[in-house]
Amino acid sequence: LMPSEKWNFSAFGKYYRQYVAGPMAEDDTGSNYVRTSRTVDSWGYGAAGTYFILSGLQAKLSYEKAYRLPTIEEMFGDEDLESGDIGIRPEKSDNINLNLSYSRSFGKHSVYVEGGVVYRNTKDYIQRNIQDLSGGKEGATYTNYGKVLTKGYNVSARYGFGRWLSVGGNFTQMNVRDNEKMQIGSTGNSVENLGYKARIPNVPYQFADFDVNFYWRDLWKKGNILSVTYDNQYMHSFSYYSQAIGSKNKDFMVPDQFSHNLTLSYSLKNGRYNISFECRNFTNEDLYDNFSLQKAGRAFYGKVRVHFGD
């Protein structure tokens, strides 16, 4: 629905259906497997509207009753260090988003700025937890956790000059908190949740990225483009165990991470042929996954792509 160029409104509905089937181990040894299947059905809905407050300044507001269906890995694991649960339920959440964006062009210059706030009330949150395995190894399991409340914001900006320069970045802060006041104790009774209002473990909550892009158009021949891109990603340190339980939280921290990448691409004949070379983490920083396991260091990639057809 678009009553005018100044504002519009839309409503929508979604139907989710998931059917999965595959072998599941009957015990921890994995000596015997049985074929298991499951079907999940869910309905979602929402509404969104936009309004131009001033020329170039737009407000956006949306609400959605959303579902996140479990992934194959969350249901079946990876037959190595990930243990799945075929009975895991979809996440249910009420999501509210409010955004303000401003765009303007003057001469060869263009500016775009956007900021937004997020509110998400989630039930049956799908959580990835650590478990001890034999031989001193650790693995992961997936469970539904009762209630989780997310409040956050994000800011992004981009500047362009003519057709040869683009600079931009994003910053995000997501406060993901345990919103379950009570939990089931070891004897089956209801007890106070010591992690209530604490950050959900193993979830990054502050991160940012930045990129600079240079373009040389019609280089050596009309329709060819050479582009050079520098980008980086920053992630603030976070805990992969509950910070509300235990006294040595620093032992379970994923440290700050800041990586840098460089990409060189050359496109020929209006994009029909493309060659690119990329160096990821070219400063060889120490990078980690969500369980503080170190990732590979500096890496080089090359890619050739050919577009067939008109």
Spans of features found by a protein language model:
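Hydrophobic, lipid-facing positions within transmembrane beta-strands of outer-membrane proteins
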Residues: L1, W43-A47, A59, G84, ...
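Surface-exposed extracellular loop regions of Gram-negative outer-membrane beta-barrel proteins
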Residues: L1-S31, V40-G46, E64, R68, ...
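Transmembrane beta-strands of outer-membrane beta-barrel pores
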Residues: Y15-A21, Y63-L69, F76-D78, R104, ...
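Membrane-embedded beta-barrel scaffold of Gram-negative outer-membrane proteins
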Residues: T50-F52, G56-E64, P90-K151
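C-terminal beta-signal and adjacent terminal beta-strands/loops
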Residues: Y67, K123, V167, V228, ...
